[in-house]
Amino acid sequence: MLKYPDYISKLISFLKKLPGIGFKSAEKIAFELLEWDPSQVEAMGLAMQEFSASHATCPDCFCLKTSKTSSCDFCSESRDSSFLCIVATPKDVFSFEKSKIFKGRYFVLGNLLSPITGKHLSLEKLNILKQRIEDFAPKEMIIALDATLEGDATALFLKQEFSHLPIKISRLALGMPVGLSFDFIDSNTLARAFSGRNCF
């Protein structure tokens, strides 16, 4: 049986690494790209190179920065340091920014606690978070994590970790769909959940 040329197989193997993309989808995308004008494929390749060379996260809050040399927009003095929003991913930050309801600072956790897989929070990030709270002394820490098993476990851990501090700890209001990622929640629903957040 004849196999795909190596350049097709290699592309398919990389595409399969993307979330939600299986072999069939990767195969379809690869052959769709064969129909593109070579200049379009080259432009996409350059965009990927620029992405690799330019993307950077802030070492203090772990939000995405505009470039490796730029300062962090989310750590600027224009943000309200009395409110600290804890999120799971840099993408979650932009979900809240679209809702235009939060003007405070963020902290991106990255990995969440997983009772099933035994995954733990990054000790390094946890120490940086503690330092951020010590430096800025926010009056409220808003735990804005997905309503999933991992999100709930992480929220409970954070509550226990910081309950001794004179800081209000809250979670997004009930009504957020259980098990659903912020990716699938519209800005209005997110804004209502944020404004109606409860003490945790």
Swiss-Prot record:
The keyword DNA damage applies. Residues 82-177 form the Toprim domain. Pfam families: RecR_C (PF21175), RecR_HhH (PF21176), Toprim_4 (PF13662). GO terms for biological process: DNA recombination; DNA repair. This is Recombination protein RecR. The keyword Transcription does not apply. The gene is recR. It comes from Chlamydia muridarum (strain MoPn / Nigg). A zinc finger (C4-type) spans 58-75. It comes from the Bacteria. Keywords: DNA damage, DNA recombination, DNA repair, Metal-binding, Zinc, Zinc-finger. Belongs to the RecR family. May play a role in DNA repair. It seems to be involved in an RecBC-independent recombinational process of DNA repair. It may act with RecF and RecO. HAMAP family: RecR (MF_00017). One of its GO terms (molecular function) is zinc ion binding. CDD domains: TOPRIM_recR. InterPro entries: DNA_Rcmb_RecR, Rcmb_RecR, Rcmb_RecR_Znf, TOPRIM_dom, TOPRIM_RecR.
